């Protein structure tokens, strides 16, 4: 279970540094945007709902791509929205500070889009059902999220450190994510045409501490309410094993497993 109060605090604290460190999130964003560019022309007058807009990176790209659209952008971190509002190309955007899981929608949208956000939801299926109800016929719901292979090196190193020290409890080093098949099952919605694709980005860092620092700087540290690592000696063992087992030619490696989903709402046949 995600602790939303803690998560909100971390994202507010990371607002200033987010864009500098969100390299993978930007790659994921452009994969989503390429789907929209194939589907709509720049003259399209469409209603767009963006969820988890953060500092407005995707928001601004949407505004540039579809200048005749109206965009509603939502995030629950006030500091993130404050930065998004300072971007140059957001004149056709209305910002709202709300929790996606408590969002009450009153109109329908042609496009509902979210980049690297839905992994922070406690009930993804319920959110998808709510969003699908407010999607126009032939509209598209598309989002990216992180998959179960994300940070596999970190999880493997932590598990090996526990085994080395004969620790058998359920402590973890970070959040676990859905597999492609699990996500596909969750996204099966009546009258919806679902497509799921995946890719892995391998990022390199000079040392493990630099990698963990980059995670903190985008606010993405563990916000689960469950048990997590609080032992300094176990943490040091994990760092040592990570650098021993997962160092490549360009430094230590970190896998980001990205899942891309787009669902088209079909009319009655």
From Swiss-Prot:
Keyword Magnesium: no
Organism listed in the record: Bacillus cereus (strain ATCC 14579 / DSM 31 / CCUG 7414 / JCM 2152 / NBRC 15305 / NCIMB 9373 / NCTC 2599 / NRRL B-3711)
Gene name linked to the record: bioC
Signal peptide coordinates: none
SUPFAM superfamilies assigned: S-adenosyl-L-methionine-dependent methyltransferases
Pathway given in the UniProt record: Cofactor biosynthesis; biotin biosynthesis
Classification via InterPro entries: BioC (IPR011814), Methyltranfer_dom (IPR025714), SAM-dependent_MTases_sf (IPR029063)
EC number: 2.1.1.197
GO BP, sorted A to Z: biotin biosynthetic process; methylation
Protein purpose: Converts the free carboxyl group of a malonyl-thioester to its methyl ester by transfer of a methyl group from S-adenosyl-L-methionine (SAM). It allows to synthesize pimeloyl-ACP via the fatty acid synthetic pathway.
GO MF term set: carboxyl-O-methyltransferase activity; malonyl-CoA methyltransferase activity; methyltransferase activity
Record carries keyword Methyltransferase: yes
Keywords: Biotin biosynthesis, Methyltransferase, S-adenosyl-L-methionine, Transferase
Superkingdom, taxonomy of origin: Bacteria
Reactions catalysed: malonyl-[ACP] + S-adenosyl-L-methionine = malonyl-[ACP] methyl ester + S-adenosyl-L-homocysteine
Homology family: Belongs to the methyltransferase superfamily.
Enzyme class: transferase
Protein name: Malonyl-[acyl-carrier protein] O-methyltransferase
């Amino acid at each position: 279970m995600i602790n939303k109060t803690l998560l909100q605090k971390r994202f507010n604290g990371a607002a200033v540094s987010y864009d500098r460190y969100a390299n993978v999130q930007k790659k994921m964003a452009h994969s989503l945007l390429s789907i929209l560019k194939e589907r709509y022309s720049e003259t399209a007058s469409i209603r767009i709902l963006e969820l988890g807009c953060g500092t407005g990176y995707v928001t601004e790209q949407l505004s540039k791509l579809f200048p005749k659209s109206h965009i509603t952008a939502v995030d629950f971190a006030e500091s993130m929205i404050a930065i998004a509002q300072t971007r140059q190309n957001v004149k056709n955007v209305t910002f709202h500070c709300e929790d996606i899981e408590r969002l009450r929608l009153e109109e329908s949208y042609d496009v509902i889009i979210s980049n690297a956000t839905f992994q922070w939801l406690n009930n993804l299926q319920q959110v998808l059902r709510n969003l699908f109800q407010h999607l126009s016929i032939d509209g598209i719901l598309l989002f990216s999220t992180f998959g179960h292979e994300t940070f596999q090196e970190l999880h493997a190193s932590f598990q090996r450190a526990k085994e080395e020290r004969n620790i058998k409890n359920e402590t973890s080093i970070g959040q676990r994510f859905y597999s492609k098949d699990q996500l596909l099952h969750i996204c099966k919605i009546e009258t919806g045409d679902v497509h799921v694709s995946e890719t892995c980005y391998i990022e390199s860092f000079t040392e493990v501490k630099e990698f963990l620092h980059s995670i903190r700087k985008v606010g993405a540290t563990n916000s689960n309410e469950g048990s997590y690592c609080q032992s300094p000696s176990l943490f040091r063992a994990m760092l040592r094993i990570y650098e021993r087992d997962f160092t490549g030619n360009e430094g230590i490696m970190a896998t980001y497993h990205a899942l891309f989903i787009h669902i088209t709402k079909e009319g009655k046949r």
